[in-house]
Amino acid sequence: MTTKLIPAQQYHDIFIAGQPLIDLRAPIEFDRGAFPSSVNLPLMVDKEREKVGTCYKAQGQQAAIALGHSLVHGVVKQQRIDAWLNFLSANPEAYLYCFRGGLRSQLTQQWLQEAGVTAPYVQGGYKGMRQYLIGVIETAPSQQPLLSLSGMTGSGKTDFLRLRKEAIDLEGIANHRGSSFGKNIDPQPTQINFENQLAIALLRHQLGNHACLLLEDESFLIGRSALPQSFYSAMQTADIVVLEEDDDIRLTRLLDEYVHKMHLGFSERLGLEAGFEAFSHYLLQSLGSIRKRLGGKQYQELQDMMQQALSQQLNQNQTSQHMAWISLLLHKYYDPMYEYQLQKKAGNILFRGSHQAMHEWLDNY
């Protein structure tokens, strides 16, 4: 058998290119974390892997290998090979990887060669590539200056970032808009997948030779996605630019984001009746998540206003009443909290301005 190995020195190229990858690990391993360009076509499923692992601990490697062969043979073995062959037929440049680039990769490569197809496997496997990406995140702040984009809730920071080549959209990677109402219809990635996608975005950003790395001024947690500690610490000391927007535009933007887009998304996913129920639950649950910080009286006032707005929307198909609770939430909760947090970093502020002024300032940064 000819062993074709992709060395660790090519990790950078693998992630920059979005190299198609076959992840040979069991589904339970894949679900904890993998890479964006990978597909899970396991050598062993969860129960098979568990049995082999138990055997390895009790009887050693050779006994575990023998058990693995007895579990994956005949029709089952052929089904696994066919799945790999089908993927490789559509993606002939794909690489294989298992946890450490060991027995599972080698055995899969051997079976594929016996079927007439050569597929290289990645040295170090998942563990090696994962450690490489962790290193990318840890060293990224030293590669170029960080610039933090701040601005009141509803000022359009995400829309602004998406127009800038020197920016990375952390909320896009986390699939969460950062605030208590920031949940999206689709779930957030696992913590490992969030970190892996962030690292790959950083690698690609570094190719652009930009003057800075522009990021939204985020909390440590974006929904349930935690920014890596070293990266978050670097963000806390970064220079700040503040995006300014008129109140009426902020309110209109939040009405669109919290109400129109979320209602439409739930309705398209679940149908009109179930969609409206899920949308209502999203709003009320989001408000409930900040109940303690609002205090009982203000929470009750906002909840009553929200339920009245939902009733109007359901019965009259109008959303204007939502503006009342959004306005109160902004002016009594979000804005004071934002001003307090920004004041602590006032010495780091380099510039304040509108969307247009901010674009012009950054173009000359």
From Swiss-Prot:
Any GO molecular function: transferase activity, transferring alkyl or aryl (other than methyl) groups
All residue ranges annotated as the Rhodanese domain in the record: 15-138
Reaction(s) the record says it catalyses: 5-methylaminomethyl-2-thiouridine(34) in tRNA + selenophosphate + (2E)-geranyl diphosphate + H2O + H(+) = 5-methylaminomethyl-2-selenouridine(34) in tRNA + (2E)-thiogeraniol + phosphate + diphosphate; 5-methylaminomethyl-2-thiouridine(34) in tRNA + (2E)-geranyl diphosphate = 5-methylaminomethyl-S-(2E)-geranyl-thiouridine(34) in tRNA + diphosphate; 5-methylaminomethyl-S-(2E)-geranyl-thiouridine(34) in tRNA + selenophosphate + H(+) = 5-methylaminomethyl-2-(Se-phospho)selenouridine(34) in tRNA + (2E)-thiogeraniol; 5-methylaminomethyl-2-(Se-phospho)selenouridine(34) in tRNA + H2O = 5-methylaminomethyl-2-selenouridine(34) in tRNA + phosphate
Gene3D superfamilies noted in UniProt: Rhodanese-like domain
Stretches of the chain forming a coiled coil according to its record: none
Matches recorded under SUPFAM superfamilies: Rhodanese/Cell cycle control phosphatase
InterPro entries noted in UniProt: Rhodanese-like_dom, Rhodanese-like_dom_sf, SelU
Domain of life: Bacteria
Active site: 98
EC number from the UniProt entry: 2.9.1.3
Keywords from the UniProt entry: Selenium, Transferase
GO biological process: one example: tRNA wobble uridine modification
PANTHER family, A to Z: TRNA 2-SELENOURIDINE SYNTHASE (PTHR30401:SF0)
Record function comment: Involved in the post-transcriptional modification of the uridine at the wobble position (U34) of tRNA(Lys), tRNA(Glu) and tRNA(Gln). Catalyzes the conversion of 2-thiouridine (S2U-RNA) to 2-selenouridine (Se2U-RNA). Acts in a two-step process involving geranylation of 2-thiouridine (S2U) to S-geranyl-2-thiouridine (geS2U) and subsequent selenation of the latter derivative to 2-selenouridine (Se2U) in the tRNA chain.
The protein's name: tRNA 2-selenouridine synthase
